């Protein structure tokens, strides 16, 4: 079989025009078209009067033709496998060249990027002391701030109120007797706040003036 595959010529298309590869042993046809051709010949032989006389020998001829078709199929597959192996072996030989090209490009990129990293190192280290100075100054400014003690006495009578005290809008804490604005002379202007709230909730809607032509 190996000698037969080596002696086969290059791939050729089927003579019937089906698009598959043909074989000179099958009259330039592919395996499928060759089987159809054999079946047509057998059918035409059966229809002839000569074929009726030799009806007993037809099964043997059919089996022989099928064996021949199988042998041609095996030959075609072997030829196709040899051509595919040759086509696969071609890019394998070209792999070392591509690897060398990639290694050369990687080495050039490393040489180009190496001086950039050396220049960027002092630039990063220089602003480090300037960044630390404002952080220390901010910590010094925040240090003197102390939490304000909670008010727990009435602003008027200085009575301990605790959690039962009343906060006024003027910002002071009062007991139950002095919580009203008229009891502790509250300086907060409630009228101005109410007027501003009314203006905000009820805006004045004015129609646009008609422009004369």
UniProtKB/Swiss-Prot annotation:
Subunit description: Homooligomer and/or heterooligomer. Interacts (via A20-type domain) with IKBKG and RIPK1 and with TRAF6 (via AN1-type domain). Interacts with ubiquitin and polyubiquitinated proteins. Identified in a heterotrimeric complex with ubiquitin and SQSTM1, where ZFAND5 and SQSTM1 both interact with the same ubiquitin molecule.
Pfam families: zf-A20 (PF01754), zf-AN1 (PF01428)
Keyword entries, A-Z: Acetylation, Cytoplasm, Metal-binding, Phosphoprotein, Ubl conjugation pathway, Zinc, Zinc-finger
SUPFAM superfamilies in the cross-refs: AN1-like Zinc finger, Glucocorticoid receptor-like (DNA-binding domain)
Record organism: Rattus norvegicus
The protein, known as: AN1-type zinc finger protein 5
Binding, Zn(2+) 2: 154, 157, 175, 178
Domain notes: The A20-type zinc finger directly binds polyubiquitin chains and associates with the 26S proteasome. The zinc-finger A20-type domain is essential for inhibition of NF-kappa-B activation.
Gene for this chain: Zfand5
Biased composition annotated in UniProt, kind: Basic and acidic residues: 139-148
Zinc finger map (A20-type): 8-42
GO biological-process terms attached to the record: face development; fibroblast migration; in utero embryonic development; platelet-derived growth factor receptor signaling pathway; respiratory system process; skeletal system morphogenesis; smooth muscle tissue development; vasculature development
PROSITE patterns: ZF_A20, ZF_AN1
Protein task: Involved in protein degradation via the ubiquitin-proteasome system. May act by anchoring ubiquitinated proteins to the proteasome. Plays a role in ubiquitin-mediated protein degradation during muscle atrophy. Plays a role in the regulation of NF-kappa-B activation and apoptosis. Inhibits NF-kappa-B activation triggered by overexpression of RIPK1 and TRAF6 but not of RELA. Also inhibits tumor necrosis factor (TNF), IL-1 and TLR4-induced NF-kappa-B activation in a dose-dependent manner. Overexpression sensitizes cells to TNF-induced apoptosis.
Superkingdom per UniProt: Eukaryota
């Amino acid at each position: 079989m190996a000698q037969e595959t080596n002696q086969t010529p290059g791939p050729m298309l089927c003579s019937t025009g089906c698009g598959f590869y043909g074989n000179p042993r099958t009259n330039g046809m592919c395996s499928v078209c060759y089987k159809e051709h054999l079946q047509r010949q057998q059918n035409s032989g059966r229809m002839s009067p000569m074929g009726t006389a030799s009806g007993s020998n037809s099964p043997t001829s059919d089996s022989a033709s099928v064996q021949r078709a199988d042998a041609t199929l095996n030959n075609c597959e072997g030829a196709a496998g040899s051509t595919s192996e040759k086509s696969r072996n071609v890019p394998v030989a070209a792999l070392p060249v591509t690897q060398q090209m990639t290694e050369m490009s990687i080495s050039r990129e490393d040489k180009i990027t190496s001086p950039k990293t050396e220049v960027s190192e002092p630039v990063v280290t220089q602003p480090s002391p300037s960044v630390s100075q404002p952080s220390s100054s901010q910590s010094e400014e925040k240090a003197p701030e102390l939490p304000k003690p909670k008010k727990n006495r009435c602003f008027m009578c200085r009575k301990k109120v605790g959690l039962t005290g009343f906060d006024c809008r003027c910002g002071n804490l009062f007991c139950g007797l002095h919580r009203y604005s008229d009891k502790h002379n509250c300086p907060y202007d409630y009228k101005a706040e109410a007027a501003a709230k009314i203006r905000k909730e009820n805006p004045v809607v004015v129609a646009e003036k008609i422009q004369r032509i």
